[in-house]
Amino acid sequence: MSTFVSEFLLGGSGKRVAIKDSIDIAGHPTRSGSRAFADAPPATRHADVVQSVLDAGWQIVGKTNLHELAFGVTGINDWSGTPINPQAPDRVPGGSSSGSAAAVAAGLADIAIGTDTGGSVRVPAACCGIAGLKPTYGRVSRAGAQPAVSSLDCVGPFAANMQDLIAAMQVICPGFAPQAAPVGGVHVGFLDVACEPWLKASLMAAVDAAGWRQQRLHLDDFEAAFGAGLTVINVENWAAFGHLTGKGLIGADVEQRLLAASRTSAAELADAEVVRTRFSHQVDAALEAFSVLLLPTLPDLPPTLAQARNGSQAVAGMTPLVRPFNLSGHPALTVPVTLVDSGLKVGLQIVGRKGQDEWVCALGAQLQQSITAHQ
């Protein structure tokens, strides 16, 4: 079913962990979902996060599929296959860490490790109805992950429940010390962003049920940060993968995106860095007034596979609410919330102060406990 690109057992008898195939495991090739790396030699050493998983006595169960070169949000991959979204088989699994999210949602792994450059952990987690964390930039080692250089990308965990996700952070993030859930006094800023009204209503109801006090909030440069984030992604991905274009080695969608990325100017990058600084300060200032910031992970249900293949605008709408926090570097967690009418799970995003991943996870756990109690 294309969730895994290779299945094997490595390590102890602890929790089952799936690893995205853009992260090195010694003895196994890292192909990043691309024909361009079909003949890649086996990695000679483990990525830091893989070594941490093995040191904890956990069991790696295989390498998971992804959107080619981790440069896409649908998870559709015509070379290595497209994972099935376990909660909605007619809809995209999300990308780029599609197989990682699908493996956890299908119960094939307790935890998965992915990467998030512009939403690539949070988007598939939300699509597949599980939890996923983009840690504070730099908090979790990227050594052994592709691309080798990125000012946006973060290695992060997926899990069906917050207890497992927190356990994963304890393993892959040195110094991660879980915090107890707060008792009262949680004042959250719910960002005023464009999304389907019924989706926002469901998420706000879950927040109310948790006993959190919420207030609407607007960030002036939120939309600009989305565009600036793409500018930075384009420059960095062209530097990493531009040499693969024009050779028939990569899929048409990724080839087109890379060629478009090649036209990014130095002036555009400079402007994006100005937005990065300004928006980061805006988020920092907002977090002085609120415990965390909240917003939907996706503005709508994931597009169907048919919509995605037909180039629907729904695909372009998958990342506006996640990419800004790659640009700013703040930790951002998506927690599943069940829609009353359909039974599908959508994502509520929790954004915290830099370095306070533990606090973000504590609130995520509290929210999930409240949701379970009210079901």
Which positions does each model-derived feature cover?
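Gly/Ser-rich catalytic serine loop of serine hydrolases
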Residues: 45, 89-101, 114-115, 119-120, ...
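Gly/Ser-rich, acidic/histidine-flanked active-site/gating loops
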Residues: 17, 23, 171-231, 256, ...
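Short, well-ordered alpha-helical
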Residues: 1-47, 52, 66-72, 196, ...
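Structural helix-boundary/capping segments
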Residues: 55, 106, 110-111, 115-194, ...
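Short helix-loop capping/hinge segments that flank enzyme active sites or metal/cofactor-binding pockets
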Residues: 14-32, 231-277, 336-345
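Short pre-catalytic strand/loop immediately N-terminal to key active-site residues, enriched for Gly-Thr
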Residues: 37-43, 81-96, 311, 318
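Alpha-to-beta junction loops
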Residues: 57-61, 107-111, 290-292
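Serine-dependent amide/ester hydrolase catalytic core
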Residues: 50, 240-327
